[in-house]
């Protein structure tokens, strides 16, 4: 029974080396080692540097996680890992390490799509979330509106045609020298600022549910380049206005999709879902329309391995398994 089985999960798709251990509904360990300090001086994630850091840290983090859970490696029943999308080098480090663990203890090895992990993240702390529901997945590399009719039945209604929302935050933050990652930096600088101080565009696309953020980024940089030196605009007002434009754009299409499909359950995930303004407006929309809303905590919105464990567990329950549930040693000759 899955209630008693211990699932070990790995997440190394970008710049977090994350390992989690799940037993039934109980999250025993959720370790996240961030590389923000490493990449900050570059103004963004450098793929080769990220993969090297994963390789250097993953072994120690694995043993520390086992010790924290008071477990032996032989206690693990299932091993799971992210298999993409993400940075290839980073993914390879986690995939190979996880697969070697599964092989060494002769246990099933399951792969999980990174975005399905974000989609399942609310389940970590709230097992009442059930389909059908509409989810808004917003990360550094992806912006998606997904209708979940049943577990394993995911209908992509909208996506970005250029930059993702996370990229829009990061690129402008780099341009302004606000810091990295861009989303948290802009949110912090914008605290107390007037979100309506600057009129920035809310880009539209030909497809009603798709997104485009490159034009917003360009409009914001052009605004700054043409700013009168005597203008008394504050950093807080500018950051708050830019953040508001991104949040409004995200919610505009999402609200339309929810209203047109008539779903009564909504959720969200991805690193940008940690943004306090986006969460606030999502909750207001749910309250005003009598919708059930399921959001992971800000910490569980960003990349973590707990979501990989839960997604793997959910895939097993619903029989939506990415690869055959086999013991690797039985197929290695």
Segments and roles (model prediction):
Residues 1-5, 112-134, 311:
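Conserved phosphate-binding catalytic cores of ATP/NTP-utilizing and phosphoryl-transfer enzymes
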Residues 2-85, 118:
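N-terminal beta-alpha supersecondary unit
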Residues 16-22, 135-137, 143-147:
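Short beta-strand scaffold segments in enzyme catalytic cores
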Residues 72-83, 261-273, 294:
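Short glycine-rich phosphate-binding loop at a beta-alpha junction
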Residues 111-112, 266, 283-307, 322:
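Conserved phosphate-binding/catalytic loops in two-lobed NTP-binding clefts
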Residues 118-120, 296-333:
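Glycine-rich phosphate-binding/hydrolytic loop that grips phosphoryl groups
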Residues 127, 150-192, 217-226:
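Glycine-rich phosphate-binding loop plus the immediately following alpha-helix
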Residues 188-266, 275-285, 289, 315-319:
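A contiguous, well-structured pocket-lining segment that forms one wall/lid of small-molecule binding clefts
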